[in-house]
Amino acid sequence: MSFLSAEEKGLVNGLWSKVNVDEVGGEALGRLLVVYPWTQRFFQSFGDLSSADAIMSNAKVKAHGKKVLNSFSDGLKNIDDLKGAFAKLSELHCDKLHVDPENFRLLGNVLVCVLAHHFGHEFNPQVQAAFQKVVAGVASALAHRYH
């Protein structure tokens, strides 16, 4: 049984089909690093993260944000099995990278804010509610290995 109704899946897939993954991915990861600066410790090899402007214009941040959102897109294709879809990434982030799983929730919330900014009135309360469920589900799936 899915955690999203058929209507919610339609809302998520409808909006996601319009998302520019390159742009939104870089912006979401950049905003995470600006708003939650302690997350920068996982990206020390990315070069200059000394200011909001440096972070938001950093090519490595943008490239990794794109990679993150491409994985998110793949997860949306397997929305009814997020734990399976993100099992390998959960293992990587837990066992090798030692990322605090709370960061997955933070990134999900930042992504929702970025989507709201990009889509304005189209990102109505129903769409937001559906995306909040999705990012919570993805965060839970990514944290699964930690349990």
From Swiss-Prot:
In this chain, where does the modification Phosphoserine occur?
45, 51
Gene Ontology molecular function: haptoglobin binding; heme binding; hemoglobin alpha binding; metal ion binding; organic acid binding; oxygen binding; oxygen carrier activity; peroxidase activity
Q: What does the subunit section of this Swiss-Prot or TrEMBL entry state?
A: Heterotetramer of two alpha chains and two beta chains.
Origin, by domain of life? Answer: Eukaryota
Extract the PANTHER family matched here: HEMOGLOBIN FAMILY MEMBER, HEMOGLOBIN SUBUNIT BETA
Biological process according to GO: hydrogen peroxide catabolic process
Q: Residue positions of the PTM N-acetylserine? A: 2
List residues, modification N6-succinyllysine: 18, 60
> For heme b, which residues are the binding ones?
64, 93
Can you tell me which family this protein belongs to? Belongs to the globin family.
Which residues, renumbered to this chain, carry the PTM Asymmetric dimethylarginine?
Answer: 105
User: What else does UniProt say about it?
Assistant: In the cat family (felidae), the oxygen affinity of hemoglobin depends little or not at all on the association with diphosphoglycerate (DPG).
Q: Which Pfam families match?
A: Globin
Q: Where is the Globin domain?
A: 3-147
Q: What does this protein do?
A: Involved in oxygen transport from the lung to the various peripheral tissues.
Q: What is this protein called?
A: Hemoglobin subunit beta-1
Organism ancestry:
Eukaryota, Metazoa, Chordata, Craniata, Vertebrata
Which Gene3D superfamilies does the annotation name?
Globins
Keywords from UniProt, A to Z, are: Acetylation, Heme, Iron, Metal-binding, Methylation, Oxygen transport, Phosphoprotein, Transport
Query: What is the tissue specificity?
Result: Red blood cells.
Got a GO cellular component term for this one?
A: haptoglobin-hemoglobin complex
